[in-house]
């Protein structure tokens, strides 16, 4: 496909302006000294939520968050196989500039709803309104390398997909929730170029404060058995094929290292376009992330690629929550970069009691973490049994009684 020159410009600029060693020096976390700071974030998604579907909803959402002394929003900008902003890169790759509504049913893309958006640029308006309210905006690549199985990108570029062992098409399928998914191959140069071009375009066109990946900037350990990746592995191992055991130590190490190498390119592109932008990662705890998703985020931190870490600690008891935060890799990160805690405030039809949320925030504070982020916006105010909306709102106001600047490097 015809390529936009965002990536070439970004990488050239990065090579001229930085070496990675400039960023890898271990630095103390400034959240531990000086004026009080705290990450007070919330994820904004287009799944089970309508907050991104109109300018009026965006305005009301941001005003509510600012009034309650939040300081950071993580809006989804890459979800369900589409960008949530007009993208030339996406249009060239899949034929669509953007897609705000997830393809939740078998009929696929809802063209009527998308057409009703007209020429609206969600992200442009959101960034402007957030900054007016002193909210930082760190766009969130929610789906990472994951796509719905029926996504236009997957249909147009089947060679970009990786697979498990077995016969196609079943070997490409991955079930998360009730919707079948597929995975872009993070080791394929055309996939990497597509993702880097999206990032360069985003950083060049929007006054954002950073970029965030989560547990989907990864690959389920069962994947990687496509012909391209097998041949790549053989080239690096004297003709030897990867183990049929997906958990094999060398096979796991090699795939994780390739993802780490790609994050180096991501970091350079971000910094070339927007030097002060924060590269944020919101993974699962390290042992699980590496074993099941080939994410070696402690290594990413050591290499200086991560400038903010929000570990997803979605636990239904305070003791489990506290014990997870005692993990050595989390403690090491806490002493190096702003490290916050992702707290689950609820899922669709599964509200989390506000008392548990309050306790978890307090544990994170007592243990010296740089802040918290709630998943996700709508459920912050979704009542659990025995609660009222006013109960939850009052609790949030008490948690964030005074405004705070974000913790940052």
PLM regions with names:
Residues 85-99, 145-176, 215-243:
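Aromatic- and acidic-residue-enriched segments that line the glycan-binding/catalytic groove
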Residues 36-44, 49-52, 121, 144-205:
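Active-site-adjacent "subsite" loops/lids of carbohydrate-active enzymes
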Residues 63-70, 126-130, 160, 183-218:
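An active-site-proximal structural segment forming one wall of the substrate-binding cleft
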Residues 70-118:
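Aromatic-lined carbohydrate-binding/catalytic grooves of carbohydrate-active enzymes
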Residues 306-321, 328, 335-409:
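Substrate-binding cleft of secreted/luminal carbohydrate-active enzymes
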Residues 70-80, 120-174, 212-215:
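Glycine-rich, aromatic-flanked loop segments that form ligand/cofactor-binding clefts
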Residues 234-350:
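Glycoside hydrolase catalytic-domain groove-lining segments
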Residues 57-83, 205-210, 305-306, 366-371:
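Catalytic domains of carbohydrate-active enzymes, especially glycoside hydrolases
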């Amino acid at each position: 496909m015809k390529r936009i020159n965002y990536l070439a410009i970004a990488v050239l600029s990065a090579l001229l302006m930085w070496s990675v060693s400039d960023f890898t020096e271990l630095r103390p976390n400034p959240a531990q000294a000086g004026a009080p700071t705290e990450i007070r974030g919330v994820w904004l998604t287009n799944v089970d939520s309508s907050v991104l579907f109109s300018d009026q909803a965006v305005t009301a959402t941001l005003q509510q968050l600012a009034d309650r002394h939040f300081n950071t929003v993580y809006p989804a900008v890459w979800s369900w196989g589409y960008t949530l902003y007009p993208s030339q890169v996406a249009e060239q790759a899949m034929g669509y500039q953007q897609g705000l509504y997830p393809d939740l049913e078998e009929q696929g893309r809802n063209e009527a709803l998308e057409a009703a958006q007209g020429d609206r640029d969600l992200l442009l308006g959101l960034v402007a309104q957030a900054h007016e309210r002193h909210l930082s905006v760190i766009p969130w690549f929610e789906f990472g390398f994951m796509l719905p199985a029926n996504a236009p990108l997957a249909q147009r570029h089947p060679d970009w997909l990786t697979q498990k062992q077995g016969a196609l098409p079943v070997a490409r399928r991955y079930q998360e929730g009730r919707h079948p998914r597929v995975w872009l191959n993070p080791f394929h140069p055309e996939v990497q170029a597509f993702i880097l071009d999206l990032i360069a375009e985003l950083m060049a066109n929007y006054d954002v404060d950073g970029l965030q990946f989560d547990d989907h900037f990864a690959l389920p350990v069962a994947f990687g058995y496509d012909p391209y990746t097998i041949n790549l592995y053989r080239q690096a191992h004297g003709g030897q094929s990867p183990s049929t055991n997906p958990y094999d130590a060398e096979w796991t190490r090699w795939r994780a290292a390739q993802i780490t190498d790609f994050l180096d390119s991501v970091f350079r592109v971000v910094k070339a376009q927007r030097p002060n932008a924060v590269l944020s990662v919101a993974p699962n705890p390290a042992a699980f992330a590496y074993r099941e998703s080939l994410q070696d985020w402690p290594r990413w931190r050591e290499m200086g690629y991560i400038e903010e870490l929000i570990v997803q600690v979605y636990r239904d008891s305070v003791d489990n929550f506290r014990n997870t935060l005692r993990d050595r890799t989390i403690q090491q990160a806490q002493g190096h970069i702003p490290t916050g805690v992702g707290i689950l405030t609820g899922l669709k039809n599964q509200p989390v009691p506000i008392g548990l949320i309050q306790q978890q925030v307090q544990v994170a504070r007592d243990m010296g973490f740089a802040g918290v982020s709630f998943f996700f916006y709508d459920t912050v105010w979704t009542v659990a049994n025995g609660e009222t909306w006013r109960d939850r709102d009052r609790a949030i106001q008490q948690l964030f009684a005074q405004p705070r600047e974000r913790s940052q490097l």
